[in-house]
Amino acid sequence: MDPYRHRPSSAFNAPFWTTNSGAPVWNNNSSMTVGPRGPILLEDYHLVEKLANFDRERIPERVVHARGASAKGFFEVTHDITNLSCADFLRAPGVQTPVIVRFSTVIHERGSPETLRDPRGFAVKFYTREGNFDLVGNNFPVFFIRDGMKFTRHVHPLKPNPKSHIQENWRILDFFSHHPESLNMFSFLFDDIGIPQDYRHMDGSGVNTYTLINKAGKAHYVKFHWRPTCGVKSLLEEDAIRVGGSNHSHATQDLYDSIAAGNYPEWKLFIQTIDPDHEDKYDFDPLDVTKTWPEDILPLQPVGRMVLNKNIDNFFAENEQLAFCPAIIVPGVYYSDDKLLQTRIFSYADTQRHRLGPNYLQLPANAPKCAHHNNHHEGFMNFMHRDEEVNYFPSRFDPSRHAERYPHPPAVCSGKRERCIIEKENNFKEPGERYRSWTPDRQERFVRRWVDALSDTRVTHEIRSIWISYWSQADRSLGQKLASHLNVRPSI
């Protein structure tokens, strides 16, 4: 018998019950005791094994994006962008690449309702011929903060109060009153699109600025955008209360049931690009994650489509153990100096090692589907069977070599070490433009949500005045409406 063929898998189920080590179990209902009513014996290894496994079924919850749902499918190139990227999976129209996607809420726990006002995660893992590519984003194209130094600090006030375990507006408004860069994100979150109807009817965005490199080594900054073919749909407060009150997993069920019924969700992938040589001509910093790139001067360019046509087989293996990291890229795609992206490159891999162990990339959902080889050996939960004698590099006994060189961005860095903010902050222009683009009733709902938040009894007069000042700088009439509703005199 080949012992490596029969690895743990549902494909090799025995016709009878066994222990984890494969020994047959003739009674899975009764403990081993001294007589029919005596104490249980410690030697009842089967009972001990069952209890020990049950006690360890749960792994650490994701610190953010704990609540989520996954599905599998494919990405197909529809437009040639080889002038921008030499990535193999983008090499020609018609090329298909397997993907797995995880949608999520951000702030609350694993069992929380999917109808809360919260950003949604939109993470895609491409299983390419040159390794995996993780595009880890959200449904909104911007973020709360622009520097990773603030990342942990911005999560804590959004999380429940550590004393009461209740999410409270005063904590959120207090923290972000120190960070007016968050205004643009709040113009999305407090808008009508703040509660997506479900995962199928929402946009996706790479959020951060990446870099595309072509075969000649020419680099372009890039933003990635997913657009659902079935359109964007959202829930207003009354609908969210109704839907969430009847099914707290409505978005997960909608995704699963739609795919099971053959109603496969589909998204188109678009990109925006900027030549780094010309970035100074814009009134925003392309590396500022709190800004969008205006589509009238930087139009969306179609790239491909993604279809989710298969449900996952096991929620734990393909959702809870599924791990994404923005550091996982392929030739033709690279990072930028986006300060938030630079932080995520480290943090995401680090949290996966904490949550799943140092060999998390060996788990089937995370492992590449292409051939791969290195000398990363051993460690906790290393289940890869390896029989080589040479576990070092280079060696004359091992033909393994370096891969062919591929282009990298030709960046030259110089400057003194310092901690500073970007020059082109411009925190108020874009949220003001968004607000003015809405219909009057949509504007009124936005105002009402802010009035409700600022009416928290623990929000001080100072904090209330700061937010009215911020929104007045974005749009004077918006600030005046807030001041009128709250009986606060605007400061500008």
From Swiss-Prot:
CC cofactor: heme
Record keyword Coiled coil present: no
Subunit structure: Homotetramer.
Listed EC numbers: 1.11.1.6
Family label: Belongs to the catalase family.
CDD domains cross-referenced by the UniProt entry: catalase_clade_1 (cd08154)
One cellular-component annotation, GO: glyoxysome
InterPro entries membership: Catalase (IPR018028), Catalase_AS (IPR024708), Catalase_clade1/3 (IPR024711), Catalase_core (IPR011614), Catalase_haem_BS (IPR002226), Catalase_immune_responsive (IPR010582), Catalase_sf (IPR020835)
Native organism: Cucurbita pepo (Vegetable marrow)
Recorded name of the encoding gene: CAT1
Protein name: Catalase isozyme 1
Function: Occurs in almost all aerobically respiring organisms and serves to protect cells from the toxic effects of hydrogen peroxide.
Active site positions, chain numbering: 65, 138
Expression sites (tissue/organ): High expression in seeds and early seedlings.
SMART domains: Catalase
Catalytic activity annotation: 2 H2O2 = O2 + 2 H2O
Positions annotated to bind heme: 348
Location within or outside the cell: Glyoxysome
GO biological process: hydrogen peroxide catabolic process; response to hydrogen peroxide
Molecular function per GO: catalase activity; heme binding; metal ion binding
Keywords: Glyoxysome, Heme, Hydrogen peroxide, Iron, Metal-binding, Oxidoreductase, Peroxidase, Peroxisome
Gene3D superfamilies recorded: Catalase core domain (2.40.180.10)
Primary subcellular site in the record, as a coarse category: other
Record keyword Iron present: yes
